[in-house]
Swiss-Prot record:
Pathway where it operates: Cofactor biosynthesis; molybdopterin biosynthesis
Consequence the record notes for mutating residue 26 to A: Loss of activity by 80%
Gene name, Swiss-Prot/TrEMBL: moaC
Protein name (record): Cyclic pyranopterin monophosphate synthase
Subunit structure as annotated in this protein's UniProt entry: Homohexamer; trimer of dimers.
InterPro entries for the chain: MoaC (IPR023045), MoaC_bact/euk (IPR047594), MoaC_sf (IPR036522), MoCo_biosynth_MoaA/MoaC (IPR050105), Mopterin_CF_biosynth-C_dom (IPR002820)
Reported effect, residue 76 to A: Reduced activity
Organism: Escherichia coli (strain K12)
Pfam families assigned: MoaC (PF01967)
Active site as annotated: 128
Length: 161
């Protein structure tokens, strides 16, 4: 079983020392969902939201969140991201929005937390913009889809049934 890397022998939280690690290309993809009533989703799709373009705002929020992950998650390293993508897709057949994010860099530590943070904040932004018309929207699941690069190797979520 793997050890927790952010806990020292005394059980105290600490930031991992990555100074001896090799720089490699690292990439991570994550997803989040926001489920809502069909009327709320139609308002977003049709561009009838009084606050403006929900998808554009959520996309920018997700990008900003990826860049600020180190400031939100206490033991994350500040990273020089080379790419952040936030894609939003309405899924009317499920009354939801699917958010997929991608983060990439060449560095000494992975970008999983950045991809997850981008997806989470984009979802929260959709909720924030639409809460005036629907307060019982559901955010989730939020999950890592894939990661590549680094010592721990590659990971890809199993295909959904």
């Amino acid at each position: 079983m793997s050890q927790l890397t952010h806990i020292n022998a005394a059980g105290e939280a600490h930031m991992v020392d990555v100074s001896a690690k090799a720089e490699t290309v690292r990439e991570a993809r994550a997803e989040a969902f926001v489920t809502m009533r069909s009327e709320t989703l139609a308002m977003i799709i049709d561009g009838r939201h009084h606050k403006g373009d929900v998808f554009a705002t959520a996309r920018i929020a997700g990008i900003q969140a990826a860049k600020r992950t180190w400031d939100l998650i206490p033991l994350c390293h500040p990273l020089m991201l080379s790419k952040v993508e936030v894609n939003l897709q309405a899924e009317p057949e499920h009354n939801r929005v699917r958010i997929e994010t991608l983060c990439r860099l060449t560095g000494k530590t992975g970008v999983e937390m950045e991809a997850l943070t981008a997806a989470s904040v984009a979802a929260l932004t959709i909720y924030d913009m639409c809460k005036a018309v629907q307060k019982d929207m559901v955010i989730g699941p939020v999950r890592l889809l894939a990661k590549s690069g680094g010592k721990s190797g590659d990971f890809k979520v199993e295909a959904d049934d």
